[in-house]
Amino acid sequence: MKIKISKESVVYQGPAYEDSHWGEVQFPEIVRCADGALAIKTHVADDSWKEFGKNQDVWCISRDNGQSWERTDNSVVSQTGYLLPSGDRLYFPLVTGVTCKRSDVKEARIVTQKLPSDRVTKEEDGSWPYPVFMYRDIFLNANHIYDLETLPDEYAKKEWLAYRIAKGETEAVPEKVKIIHPHMSVRGVMGNGDMVMAPFSPYGRGFRFDKEGNIWLTSYTGAHLNPYNGGVDVCSAALLYKSTDNGHTFELSGYIPYIPNTTKHPNAYMCDGFSETALEFMDDGSMIVLLRATSVFLGAPEWNSMYYARSTDGGKTFSEPQEFDKCGVLPNLLKLDCGVTLAAYGRPGIYVRATSDPHGVDWEDPIEVMTGEDRSSLMNDPPKRPNFHQWAGSCCNVDLKPIGPNQAILAYSDFYYPDQSGKTNKKLKTILTRMITVE
């Protein structure tokens, strides 16, 4: 098998790394418009729950299948969505995390304050409830874990905001999608100010479809309540949801908890568990997933192993997760019509792997798109000793979508790309794409 990767194309250029927030010019997402054009959404605000969902994105559009790009109005979001078997298009936007005033937050009952008779229930007066559990992360933020059903009525709804473009239409209509998830929990984080809740949105990108035409998407929990018994788990778990009604309802249909093992992985107790998850259905009917296990909030570094697991019973159970590579955030899996499945991921560096194995077990070696070595010498003003973000020179949050039976388009960021306008000699934060072709 031969994998050909094209030269990069510039989608969007923002400020220089030195003049921007972490989170700015990151998280490129590729999605189709109802008229067939390709669009890329880029986050251009801080990487914060308070900033998501505030229309702080840049949208660019391509009408030649990704060969060239131009900026477009943010209203294009109403014309985009992932195609469903029914012909509808569906899109889940990230929403803004709810802010709760510090004075309204009840302190967690811990140690001797906790009694055998205590029950965490909904407050009759509509006030904020007691958390089920509280812990502090490496930055000393207080993380409160709540049973969703105990929150005030306006926040206790098991539903996600979606935009649906009905088959034959060109404009999206907002829709509340029902969620079926036992013991569903939500996390609030409080530092020096008010408490901010995790955005109540699914975190997966796009959908996958099984042989029966059911719609699947992925998400993850953060610290959470076990859906089987309500037990507290401070490690994040991967979630798989399935819809059998054209995306109007999603039911929890796969749960992959994180089980630390320092014998195999020295950072096991510091990496915060499984988060971003990629899913693909293989030709033999099995499901494979790639699992991010990188997080700094319990003390781990900005990089960590990425894991692979496989299910042969429709997501009810998964094999024990095994290391897929030494790094991997926001992993992508994509099965092309030619029968080859691609994986894309990174941090540090950006890599593409491929397999023609119908079981998804045997993979080719990684192909390097961006080096995982120190890139800080490319900065406008290189430091003597870089921090990790300067070292990587990219958020390494990639997206991968099909554009042909044997071709995909990869979107990623490069923080040190020369200004293409000719107005400055600076290196700028840039969103790039490359074509990946299976020959």
Positions of PLM-derived features:
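Asp-box/BNR beta-propeller blade signature and adjacent active/binding-site loops
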Residues: M1-E439
